[in-house]
Amino acid sequence: MTPNALMELAKDAMLRAYAPYSGYKVGAALLDESGQIYRGCNVENASYGATICAERTAFMYWAQTGAAMRGRKPVAIAIVGGKDGVITDFAPPCGICRQVMMEFCDPDTFRIILTNGKEVRSYTLAEILPLGFGPSHLDE
């Protein structure tokens, strides 16, 4: 799947975002090594701490399908966002989402694909989370 095709799926997911408080809508499309796509959107809550990001929604969807238990590694995620769903800038993942990615992904190969509506950029997880803490740090 091309980065642009994955980005289009993220844009579609953004249409489902529930953001009545901030108005900032985000969509994500997660690709695993089998070619399966898992979409997510942000879902806000009046108790702000209960809000969940689009990226984590996509990862939780991936996990609940059993893909994690079957060892199907995520290989890329496209993320798009903007106020009222209008894309004007890049929407990089927050720190919590980066940490979730670190749990399940190879930081050197997993790609984060972003757009500002004019250009598409791609980064590895290691580039956006240098010195990331992951499961390998807990190995005995």
Give residue spans per PLM region.
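Active-site segments that bind and position negatively charged phosphate/pyrophosphate groups
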Residues: 22
